[in-house]
């Protein structure tokens, strides 16, 4: 088998175009992990978020490692009413957390 590989996690905030369209989607990209099982948890400030979360099934990349993504759908009001949002990825017992914060100006 191949060695375990920890995922690299990137968290993207909603785009300004999206906010102008009265939508807000956070995207958490998880890539280069092996084996292909991850758990994704979202948090607003420090409270868990369950609603509006959609996580894809990990798919195998060309390098035989896995990639997945998780989406959190919010309203712009929800997005702006918290200090930060976090995407927590747990893989093989270790957790990677990435956080984005809404900027005041948009």
Swiss-Prot record:
Paired cysteines (S-S): 28-87
Domain Ig-like, first and last residues per copy: 7-101
Signal peptide: none
A GO term for molecular function: antigen binding
GO CC annotations on file: blood microparticle; extracellular exosome; extracellular region; extracellular space; IgG immunoglobulin complex; plasma membrane
Locations listed in the record: Secreted; Cell membrane
Keywords recorded for this protein, A-Z: Adaptive immunity, Bence-Jones protein, Cell membrane, Disulfide bond, Immunity, Immunoglobulin, Immunoglobulin domain, Membrane, Secreted
CDD domains, alphabetized: IgC1_L
Record-linked InterPro entries: Ig-like_dom (IPR007110), Ig-like_dom_sf (IPR036179), Ig-like_fold (IPR013783), Ig/MHC_CS (IPR003006), Ig_C1-set (IPR003597), MHC/Immunoglobulin (IPR050160)
Origin: domain of life: Eukaryota
Classification via PROSITE patterns: IG_LIKE, IG_MHC
GO biological process, one term: immunoglobulin mediated immune response
Note: Displays the following serological isotype: Mcg-, Kern- and Oz-. The Mcg- isotype marker is characterized by Ala-6, Ser-8 and Thr-57; the Ke- marker by Ser-46 and the Oz- marker by Arg-83.
PANTHER family membership: IG-LIKE DOMAIN-CONTAINING PROTEIN, MHC CLASS II-RELATED
Subunit structure: Immunoglobulins are composed of two identical heavy chains and two identical light chains; disulfide-linked.
Protein role: Constant region of immunoglobulin light chains. Immunoglobulins, also known as antibodies, are membrane-bound or secreted glycoproteins produced by B lymphocytes. In the recognition phase of humoral immunity, the membrane-bound immunoglobulins serve as receptors which, upon binding of a specific antigen, trigger the clonal expansion and differentiation of B lymphocytes into immunoglobulins-secreting plasma cells. Secreted immunoglobulins mediate the effector phase of humoral immunity, which results in the elimination of bound antigens.
Protein known as: Immunoglobulin lambda constant 2
Lineage of source species: Eukaryota, Metazoa, Chordata, Craniata, Vertebrata
């Amino acid at each position: 088998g191949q060695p375990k590989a920890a995922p690299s996690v990137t968290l993207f905030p909603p785009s300004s175009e999206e906010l102008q369209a009265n939508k807000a989607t956070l995207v958490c990209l998880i890539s280069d992990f092996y084996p292909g099982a991850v758990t994704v948890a979202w948090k607003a400030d420090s409270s868990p978020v369950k609603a509006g979360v959609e996580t894809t099934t990990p798919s195998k990349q060309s390098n035989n490692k896995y990639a997945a993504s998780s989406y959190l759908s919010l309203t712009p009001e929800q997005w702006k009413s918290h200090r930060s949002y976090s995407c927590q990825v747990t893989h093989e017992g270790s957790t990677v957390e990435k956080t984005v914060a809404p900027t005041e100006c948009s």
